[in-house]
């Protein structure tokens, strides 16, 4: 980031964490109405950035051909499986954004994933791949390399908001699982406040 901002990263991050738990302690029900639009905007930005950069190297579209994946796993062995693990990690990371939406049925969640989240993520990953193929120096931070300079700060704010929402979901999930473990007698009795 430069410009003296590097020294502010840790205090700003600490402030975001304090705010996250302060809001969590009072309940997130008032802010929950913002979670859907922010998450939707985040996925739209992801997809849009990908669309902008797929044309950096059209050969990235070969990723849809299964032979290249099989060939990669066969030729690179253990490294290929480690990278495959990263793919699964990327998918579960996106899942955290809507992990606590248990009040929705299976059908809406499946439809949202199939018709919105998955295409946006796929477009973004294809865009990142094409960008790295065209600009090898982007390999260290492919996502931020795709963000136009003029959009950097708005995307950073949106990314932070999406991370806070994902954190809320993970925290809520952890509290819920702990409460269920206590109720089942699998965890010592503790007072759980949400």
Show where each model-derived region lies.
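The structured alpha-helical core of multi-pass membrane proteins
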Residues: 1-194
